[in-house]
Regions:
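Sec-dependent bacterial lipoprotein signal peptides
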Residues: 1-21
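Bacterial Sec signal peptide processing site at the extreme N-terminus
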Residues: 14-36
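Post-signal peptide N-terminal segment of mature Sec-exported envelope proteins
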Residues: 30-51
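Short, well-ordered alpha-helical segments
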Residues: 59-100
Length: 124
């Protein structure tokens, strides 16, 4: 009987554990409204409250942060910003505007959670 119970538990674990993998990865939500050729080079970053240039179009947004069990090393400010910049390049953005930057907090998440908007300059 113990052997059968052990086999059932092991089978259940082999089915459950792979489905938990997404909980250990950086959460990333990308919404792109307009598609452009990928951008190469430097992507400018505008901080919250900073004046945005004129003649721009918002092409999308990116949210990155903790997904549940994300290791702290995988959701530092640098890792989150690199992820946002990579997504901005794929979408063809010229610059990023940081809407919200939530720093790690001992009462909540130990990871950065960043919301950014992706913009492109209007070409005349």
């Amino acid at each position: 009987m113990r052997t059968i119970n052990l086999i059932i538990v092991l089978c259940a674990l082999t089915l459950i554990l792979p489905s938990c993998k997404h909980l250990t990865e950086l959460k990333k939500i990308v919404a792109v409204n307009y598609h452009y050729p990928p951008t190469t080079g430097v992507i400018d970053v505008y901080q919250t409250g900073q004046q945005l240039p004129e003649n721009i179009i918002r092409i999308g947004s990116v949210v990155v942060g903790e997904s549940g069990l994300t290791p702290v090393k995988d959701c530092t400010y640098e890792v989150c910003m690199r992820t946002i910049e990579d997504e901005a390049r794929k979408a063809g953005a010229d610059f990023i505007y940081l809407v919200s930057v939530q720093e790690p907090d001992w009462r909540g998440s130990l990871c950065y959670n960043i919301t950014a908007e992706l913009y492109r300059y209007k070409k005349d």
